[in-house]
Amino acid sequence: IQTYPICDPISGVIELIADSRFDGAIMLNQEGKRFVEELERRDVLSEAILKQTGNYCWVLWNDNIGKISNTVKEHPTEYEAFTKQGIMATCPDLKCIADFTKMPLKQLESTVKRVSSMAGKGNDKDFHHRGGLMDMSEGQYYVIKAVPSTHHTMGGVRINEKAQALTAKGQVIPGLWAAGEVTGVTHGTNRLGGNAY
């Protein structure tokens, strides 16, 4: 299977509102620390999250990032549902974020200060964020709790190099070919996104 790293802890549904991650949102553990480069592959992110306290993370962004990603405006139903569910909050400052998430305020402030400093220098010394970090020194802030969840099954019919379907013993099944998501030997450790339709 492939997991998607940023999903609702209750239903397992992908949190599209947290796509702010692609525009600079950071992922924090319960201790208030970054633990992975936020644009890593889905399997790498999922594994990293599962190694954190409670097997979840918090995705944090501010209006500086929100103006780029526009996820709150693009996904108002999610915003309302996740807020009502108690896994998302909008806060004027980091103290409010710490109160909501139960992260230690001093560590949270230290992390955000470091991220903002590295953003200003254009150099993420901790995880080498390939998209570039953003200044998060001022609110308004948004935070959502997230867990990995099953996203895609990467199993299927075995095929040979000609895309001919094979029996369990590796023999060609005459007249039967397979391609895309029905195949089970082409994905490796991560789904080939171009095959998903």
Region spans (language model):
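Residues forming the flavin
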Residues: 1-197
